[in-house]
Amino acid sequence: MKKTWLFLTALLFSSVAFSAIDALNFSSPQQESDYHQLTQSLRCPQCQNNNIADSNATIAVDMRGKVFELLQEGKSKNDVVDYMVARYGNFVTYDPPITASTLVLWIAPLLLVLLGVVFLLRRKPKTQSAVKSQEILTDEDNARLAELLNKDKXMNFTLIFILTTLVVALICFYPLLCQFKAKHGQKRDDLNKALYFSRLEEIEQDNSQGLVENVEQLKQELQKTLLDDVPSKVQENVDYSGKSYGKIWFISGVLALGIIAGPSYFMVGSWQAESMLEQTYAKLPYFFDRMKNEDKNPFSDTEMQQFSTALRIDLQKNPTDAKKWWMLGQIGMNLGDARLAFDSYQKANKLEPDNVQYKLGYARILMFSEDATDKLKGGNLLREVIRQEHTNIEALSLLAFRYFETEDYKMAAVTWAMMLRLMPKDDERVPLIEKSIRTARDALEAQNEEKSKSITPEK
């Protein structure tokens, strides 16, 4: 008895499974291939997530039959698709045509990018005046100017944040603002009615040809199917009454996006670092005043770092100020940042190549380099300085050190002796230079003895 029930259950499910398979007689393999391709590429209007080949809905069965009928009439695949689109709308295809609503989704991101580019170009700093701001503005004016610039930047950030939020919200929530010409329920009713009359016409044709016997029963079944597919008015109102709240949902989505984006930026964004940089830059006039009393009140390491940061920001806005580049090089030397000093001195010398002070600072950093090419370039710069100023003690000192380093002890001693003649006798550096001269002469004698030994053959 148990085996009999299992057999009947299996037979029941197998009959249900095979009921979805259409028994069709194709005239050619190509026609069969076209049929399967079309049924897999057309979407079921009732199921929406399935194609008509996989759907068992009544409308899907009728659509499969219509596809077969049109192919039997010699229609092409494009003709079949055009027929289905004309009858059921663009929804039945998985590749709908481009419309105004789809263009918005494609063009909006490009417009957002173009808007950002235009904004960046408009923010490009204008050409700075040739007159230095420090000569025409007081410290109070500089402080007020920095405060105004900070307000403008905060206003720009707020406008960008609001604009970006609105554009993203429009792209994401645009469908909520769309006002459809017909409701979903009305479209479905019209589709079911059209299907009902089409099927009724087919039954009448089959009856006139004597292909069916129980015409009334088929009509009653068709009417029952129509009633089952069309829900009651109460259910229709309950299911789709919420569609009138599209604008409310849109506003809620925009607010939610702003609430999420704002705290997220303040948590992980770089606004704190940018704010600190702006505060440091605003202290630049204060650092210039401190330089006047640096001997009595020297800079601390922290203040030196802040001064360096403020100068960098200022040089980004006015990169042609050679004096500030030289000052940044001096700060780099005090901080022990050789790369900062090298780049700053190089920039200052490039902007004003005839300035002896800038050329001397660049030559000094080159002389301290371990690269032979840099040392050679530094020596050439020192000779240029001495040709411009024959009495430049610092240039002579660096050149004498260069001679001593290359074991040219004679020129080192001569250069130091020249420095002695230029310096006052009571100068604190005189004993050190005299000692350097003696060291150079001793090294020269040892060098000459070594040369004489190498020249004189041993007996």
From Swiss-Prot:
Protein's UniProt keywords contain Chloroplast: no
InterPro entries documented for this protein: C-type_cytochrome_biogenesis (IPR051263), CcmH/CycL/Ccl2/NrfF_N (IPR005616), CcmH/CycL/NrfF/Ccl2_sf (IPR038297), Cyt_c_biogenesis_CcmI (IPR017560), TPR-like_helical_dom_sf (IPR011990), TPR_CcmH_CycH (IPR056413), TPR_rpt (IPR019734)
GO cellular component: periplasmic space; plasma membrane
Gene3D superfamilies reported for this sequence: Cytochrome C biogenesis protein, Tetratricopeptide repeat domain
Intracellular or extracellular location(s): Periplasm
Keywords annotated in UniProt: Cytochrome c-type biogenesis, Heme, Iron, Metal-binding, Periplasm, Repeat, Signal, TPR repeat
Matches recorded under Pfam families: CcmH, TPR_CcmH_CycH
Swiss-Prot/TrEMBL GO biological process terms: cytochrome complex assembly
TPR repeat start-end pairs: 322-355, 393-426
Residues reported in the UniProt entry to bind heme: C44, C47
Similarity comment: family membership: Belongs to the CcmH/CycL/Ccl2/NrfF family.
Protein name per Swiss-Prot or TrEMBL: Putative cytochrome c-type biogenesis protein CcmH
Classification lineage: Bacteria, Pseudomonadati, Pseudomonadota, Gammaproteobacteria, Pasteurellales
